[in-house]
């Protein structure tokens, strides 16, 4: 696949992510819930000032640092993707990197612009500027099962447990899926890449040997021609002298 096709995959992720966030922002209030699959899957509107899956970074300049880091990571991932495509890396790995890139860009858009255009910058602490301080919109909530730990269980007895409690978005899930597939199939991805590199190196070595062999034959042929020419030149004077006699 060409480089642009992997960026198209990332663009599709970005479009789905941003569309879902803007629809939730327009038609739902914060903390509203819509039950999709019983109690197992709900749309739950949350604003996340921090990282993926609701992880927060409570600091006046923490959000700015996080946004700058995300922007740097976004460009780094894009550069790495282009480099891996040119290197001929396994297609599955490149698709995973496209998913990660799409998710990274999706959350960068929230962090960079939503504070201004959706006016959702956090108010505690008050940011120095709304730019780069937008809160990420999360809405996917999968509380698959819940229970209360028995009192006799050490450390957690009597505590409420819910799986899966974090609320996230399409960008988060795209990054997570891309990373997990790479972790599970990295041996296959990089093994085939090494085979391709070895085959390319062997082909290059074979071509170099052919060129070297051709040059050697050409040099040998030219040397033979020079020797033959010199031999003919040596014979001509003797022929002339014999005719004079």
Regions found by a protein language model. Give the residues of each.
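Alpha-helical transmembrane bundles and membrane-interface segments of multipass inner-membrane proteins
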Residues: 1-245
């Amino acid at each position: 696949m060409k480089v642009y096709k992997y960026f198209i995959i990332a663009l599709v992720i970005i479009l789905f992510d941003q569309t879902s966030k803007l629809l939730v922002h327009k038609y739902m209030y914060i903390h509203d819930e819509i039950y999709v699959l019983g109690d197992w899957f709900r749309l739950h509107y949350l604003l996340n000032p921090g990282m993926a899956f609701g992880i927060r970074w409570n600091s006046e300049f923490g959000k700015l640092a996080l946004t700058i880091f995300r922007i740097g990571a976004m460009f780094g991932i894009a550069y790495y993707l282009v480099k891996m495509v040119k290197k001929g890396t396994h297609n599955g790995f490149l698709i995973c990197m496209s998913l990660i890139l799409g998710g990274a860009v999706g959350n960068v858009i929230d962090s960079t612009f939503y504070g201004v255009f959706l006016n959702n910058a956090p108010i505690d602490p008050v940011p120095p500027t709304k730019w780069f301080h937008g809160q990420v919109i999360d809405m996917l909530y999968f509380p698959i099962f819940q229970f209360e730990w028995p009192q006799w269980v050490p450390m957690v007895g009597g505590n409420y447990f819910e799986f899966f409690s974090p609320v996230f978005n399409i960008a988060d899930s795209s990054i997570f899926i891309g990373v997990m597939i790479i972790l599970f199939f990295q041996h296959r991805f990089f093994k085939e890449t090494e085979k391709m590199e070895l085959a390319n190196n062997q082909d290059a070595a074979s071509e170099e040997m052919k060129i070297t062999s051709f040059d050697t034959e050409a040099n040998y042929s030219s040397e033979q021609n020079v020797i033959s020419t010199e031999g003919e030149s040596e014979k001509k004077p003797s022929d002339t002298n014999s005719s004079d006699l």
